[in-house]
UniProtKB/Swiss-Prot annotation:
Binding-site residues for NADP(+), renumbered to this chain: 26-29, 49, 52, 54, 84-87, 135
Cofactor: Mg(2+)
Species lineage: Bacteria, Bacillati, Actinomycetota, Actinomycetes, Mycobacteriales
Name recorded for this polypeptide: Ketol-acid reductoisomerase (NADP(+))
Family per similarity comment: Belongs to the ketol-acid reductoisomerase family.
EC number assigned by the record: 1.1.1.86
Record key words, sorted: Amino-acid biosynthesis, Branched-chain amino acid biosynthesis, Magnesium, Metal-binding, NADP, Oxidoreductase
Residues covered by the KARI C-terminal knotted domain: 184-329
Organism for this UniProt entry: Corynebacterium kroppenstedtii (strain DSM 44385 / JCM 11950 / CIP 105744 / CCUG 35717)
Matches recorded under NCBIfam families: ilvC, PRK05479.1, PRK13403.1
InterPro entries in alphabetical order: 6-PGluconate_DH-like_C_sf (IPR008927), KARI (IPR013023), KARI_C (IPR000506), KARI_N (IPR013116), KARI_prok (IPR014359), NAD(P)-bd_dom_sf (IPR036291)
Binding annotation for substrate: 253
Length: 337
């Protein structure tokens, strides 16, 4: 099925310019959305919880900072950019009491709407604008006269103008310069979760850890194992990012290329594909999301335990030791502490 893509010429910027927009959250996406919207002539205020460390940054950027409830009462379009696990409480306690017919609530990820953890009043437009890039990239591209491709979707459309409103918002943050792709909350949510769990985070992380274990158990030095199964991953991913799998295979040695072709299917075989299908099924039927929120309600013992377990894997120690030799790496974690 062909996707439907929009550009600036398809958008009416005056629609979003006629709205009062509250951006809930001032993190990676929040600061980018707020600044780009303001530069596009939109009236914007920031909603934050009391005591938020982001409040000072938002004020320094020239925004009026309100509580989430005050922002929701003031606005007629509310973009919720708080973490998935925080959105439900924010919505129920601080946003929903102030919603009225004709208002709109927007999201950058569809999880809580798709799985009905958040249910908006029938008279409220529910839509999504999801840039396919981090906030700093969204902002930088915007200031350079470019844009980051974004997804839009509409879940509830009481006025019949939801798509036009979402497209106008997307254009105001620069997405129309690159392309705005129409999707659904279901498609965005389920594919996003699957990609994270089966490939980008869960799958890749375990692949590297298991490869490391195989080499070390076979008697190879942990440092060598780290280099071969983890450190060089960036080189490969950059090649794929720049030009696809074919570009990667063209750029590596013929030995690596041939080895990849003949051994890759031995690792990622039909059993792995069936396991991936099971992961997808548990996303689709809500099993994963229910388990995540059950853990959240209990104080996240599952997440915290797994986080500690993974952080203590021998691959992490080998990586820390080797990165200390690489002066060119700007490490986001303070590994000298």
């Amino acid at each position: 099925m062909a996707i439907k893509t929009y550009y600036d010429d398809d958008a009416d910027l005056s629609i979003i310019q006629g709205r009062k927009v509250a951006v809930i959250g001032y993190g990676s996406q929040g600061h980018a959305h707020a600044k780009c919207l303001r530069d596009s002539g939109v009236e914007v205020r920031i909603g934050l919880r009391e005591g938020s460390k982001s409040a000072e940054k938002a004020k320094e950027a020239g925004f009026e900072v309100l509580s989430n409830a005050e922002a929701a009462e003031w606005a007629d379009l509310i973009m919720i950019l708080a973490p998935d696990t925080s959105q439900i409480a924010i919505f129920e306690k601080e946003i929903e009491p102030h919603l009225k017919d004709g208002d709109a609530i927007f999201f950058a990820h569809g999880l809580n709407i798709h799985f009905k953890k958040i249910v908006a009043p029938k008279g409220v437009t529910v839509a999504m604008v999801a840039p396919k890039g981090p906030g700093h990239l969204v902002r930088r591209q915007f200031t350079e006269g470019k844009g980051v491709p974004s997804l839009i979707a509409v879940e509830n459309d009481p006025t019949g103008e939801g798509t036009a409103l979402a497209l106008s918002y997307a254009a105001a943050i620069g997405a129309g310069r690159a392309g705005v792709i129409e999707t659904t909350f279901r498609e965005e949510t389920e594919t996003d979760l699957f990609g994270e769990q089966a490939v980008l985070c869960g799958g890749l992380e375990k692949l590297m850890m298991t490869g490391f274990e195989v080499l070390v158990e076979a008697g190879y030095a942990p440092e060598m194992a780290f280099f071969e199964v983890c450190h060089e991953m960036k080189l490969i991913v950059d090649l794929i990012f720049e030009g696809g799998l074919s570009n990667m295979n063209y750029s590596i040695s013929e030995t690596a290329e041939f080895g990849g072709y003949v051994s890759g299917p031995k690792i990622i075989d039909d059993h792995v594909k069936e396991s991936m299908k099971k992961v997808l099924s548990e996303i689709q039927d809500g099993t994963f999301v229910d388990a995540m929120f059950k853990d959240v309600d209990a104080g996240q013992p599952g997440l915290k335990g797994l986080r500690e377990e993974y952080a203590n894997h021998p691959l992490e120690k080998a990586g820390k030791d080797m990165r200390s030799m690489m002066s060119w790496i700007a490490n986001p974690l303070d590994e000298t502490a």
